[in-house]
Every structure is written in structure tokens, then in C-alpha cells.
Amino acid sequence: LHIHYTGKTAHMIDADAISQYLDSDKFTVGLSDPTSTRHIVMNTTHEILSDPAVRKALQHATDRQTISDGIFYGLEQPADMLYATTVPYCNVGLKPYEYSTETAAQLLDEAGWVLGSDKMRAKDGKQLALDLLYNSDSVTEKTIAEYLQSEYLKLGISMTIHGEEEQSYRDNMKAGNFDMVFNICWGMPYDPQSSLAAMRAPVYGDYAAQQGLEDKAEIDDAITKILTSTDETERQELYKSVLTNLHEDAMYLPLTYECNKALYTSALHGVHFGTDQYDVPFADMYFE
């Protein structure tokens, strides 16, 4: 029995390799529901990213469908929200930021970031220049970063990208030493409660990146109430408040929904995914 199983902690098989088996008769590819969300965190204390209009422009300038199809072969679906609607409490009717370079350009124009003769945007003599930090151990993050760099350039946004080895990348993220940085939600069964709770303290980059939000105190207060409330209706309303604020603040740039992937011989039956990303129900698998 040989099963290749890739989840958050095991990337032995990437999307490129799995895609080669999608039309195979001998092997079957299994995909779970979304387990976590691949996204970019924008630092709201940054001089340029402190402006919600710039953050919203980047949301509209990001073609998630092309990232899903071109980089993940459709194995990871485009993400419109920080948490998938299948995550408990997270189906709260948020409106996605539709991909529209026209909307992105309009937002930047109205915010004073206008195109110069060099086709780059500037405001009061300052260029619209950002930096994106990625984990150099992740080929995928580098590929996405290079794609976004080229796409944003078409709008007159200068974005440098740089990778750091995992520990340095994590240290800088936690300290808030970034303009923009790749991140992944905690995933099931920790989302949304545990990952939101961690935003109230400098555990990861969220805390530092949220310091420029006008509604930071309001968000933290609602999260604290979620942790103590035993009334399900109240909890749902509090979650809706937090998720709506974070979505409208536009500091989280969702890219794709990560899922667990299984590649196995088609003679094997009973292969399915467990209730969380680390649960592999081997006991249910069998050969006839």
C-alpha cells in the first residue's frame, strides 16, 4: 500500500506533479474541502499601505483565478475571503473583491497615486513602491510573488520581492518587519477561533500588521467576547462583526484555499479526508 498524501506540513508532491495524474486510469487524485487559506498580510502601519484605498486597489488588482489555474492547476480554488465559507461561523455574506484592473486604477487615481511619464505611480513625489516577503523554502510562494510583481507593474506599482529562510521569515513576520508577507491560516480545527484569538497578541505577524487599523480595538474586543460567550446567536453575530471589519479593512489578501491532496492507486477504496487537516483515516481504506 503506497499513498502520497500532502497537507500543510508535507509538500513532497506539488501541484505540478499531481496534475500529471489527473487523467490517469491507474491513479486517483483526491482533494479535501478547504483546510486553510493562502494569503498575503499587508502591514497597515506602513506609510503607503496605511491607506485603505491602496489595500483595496491591490485586492482588485489580484487575479486569483489565474493563480489557481496557472500555478495550482485548479487544485487550489481561488479564495475570496480570509476564511472559506465552509469554516464554522464564517459564512457571513461578505462581498468578494472582484478582479478588475479598472477599479484598482480608479482607486489609486482617486487616492492621489497617479501615473507619471515613466508609467509608474507616485504621490507628492513619492513612488508607489512596496516589498513582498516570502519563505525561500517555498517554490510556490516565489512563483506567486513573481506573478504578482509583473501584474502590479502593469498598473504602475513597483513591488520588490525577497525570500528569506523559514526562521528568519517567521521572525520578521512576528516583529512586523515587512510591507507585505505571505501567510497561511491556521486551518481546521483551529479556525476561526484560535487564529482570531492570536491576533490580539504578538504571536504572528497579524498583531503588528493590524496596528494601523482604526477599528483594531473594536476587533480585539469582539474577539475577546467570542472566547467567553456561550450564546451561539451572540457568537455568530460577533464573528460576523469581526470578519466583516477585517474584510472591509482589506489588509488580508486571500489567494487560494489550501486543501489536502491524496494520490493513490485506483484499486484502493474508502479513501477520504478526516475532520481536520492532520487526520488521515487509514482504517477506512481497503482493497477488494
Annotate each language-model stretch with its function.
Residues 69, 111-134, 181-185, 229-266:
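Bilobed periplasmic-binding protein-like "clamshell/Venus-flytrap" ligand-binding domains
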Residues 114-187, 260:
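Ligand/substrate-recognition segments at binding pockets and active sites
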Residues 134-142, 194, 208, 212:
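Extracytoplasmic "Venus flytrap"
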Residues 45-69, 219-236:
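Extended ligand-binding regions for polar small-molecule ligands
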Residues 30, 49-150, 241:
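Append "and occasionally in soluble cytosolic enzymes with long acidic Gly/Pro-rich linkers
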Residues 1-46, 57, 69, 184:
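Extracellular/periplasmic solute-recognition and catalytic clefts
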Residues 18-35, 41-51, 88-109, 116-128, ...:
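Short, solvent-exposed loop/beta-turn-alpha elements that line the ligand-binding surface or hinge
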